[in-house]
């Protein structure tokens, strides 16, 4: 079963996220697990308009590969990356690719919750969005759950300890991202925050991820 919804190192049971050139290498090398492909907001700082267009074309092409099960990570970062306009252009283009191929969009959000939620409304997005590394508080988590169906919140090594309990159980995911901790230890920390039975978060998050991807017609259990 897939349990780790976001990492940067291919592994069985994990979705590794990378830029187009990285994902192309993983596919060629037969790396394990499944993949998401996208233009990280940090990368937009170094991209000319022509380079951004070329990268978006690569994302669109790779998005149709069977082992690429999601788009991103894409999003907004107020602390790092290109201009607001360039980040927005890259994000909206990737959100539209996700809609076109019917695969989830993985979000990178730093100090910009409002812009992401406004984009969800404006696009009338139909595919799920996975908010990777969610560090918002319980009030923000509850607002997202209440007002924005289709958004899943994923918790990594660092998170607001009150937030997981505010997430609808069916929308909770876990990830390693760049942490050295294994996914079961991260899930155990979320267990403690939720006051749940040890091991239950990992099982819940795995079932949620399988259902999320299966609902989009992608079945990573068929991947290596």
Could you tell me what each predicted segment is?
Residues 1-224:
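Mid-domain alpha/beta scaffold segments of enzyme catalytic cores
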């Amino acid at each position: 079963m897939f349990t780790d919804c976001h990492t940067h190192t291919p592994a069985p049971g994990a979705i590794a996220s990378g830029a187009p050139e990285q994902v192309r290498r993983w596919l060629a090398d037969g790396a394990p697990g499944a993949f998401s492909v996208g233009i990280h907001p940090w990368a937009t700082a170094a991209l000319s308009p022509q380079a951004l267009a070329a990268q978006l074309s690569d994302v669109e092409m790779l998005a149709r590969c069977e082992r690429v099960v999601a788009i991103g990570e894409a999003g907004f970062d107020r602390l790092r990356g290109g201009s607001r306009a360039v980040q927005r252009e890259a994000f909206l283009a990737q959100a539209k690719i996700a809609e076109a191929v019917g695969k989830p969009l993985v979000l990178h959000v730093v100090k910009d919750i409002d812009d992401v939620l406004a984009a969800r409304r404006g696009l009338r997005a139909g595919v799920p969005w996975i908010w990777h590394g969610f560090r918002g508080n319980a009030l923000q988590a509850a607002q997202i759950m209440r007002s924005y169906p289709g958004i899943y919140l994923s918790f990594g090594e660092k998170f607001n300890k009150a937030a997981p309990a505010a997430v609808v159980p069916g929308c909770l995911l876990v990830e390693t991202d760049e942490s050295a901790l294994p996914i079961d230890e991260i899930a155990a920390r979320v267990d403690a925050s939720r006051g749940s039975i040890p091991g239950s978060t990992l099982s819940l998050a795995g079932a949620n991820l399988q259902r999320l991807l299966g609902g989009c017609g992608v079945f990573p259990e068929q991947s290596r």
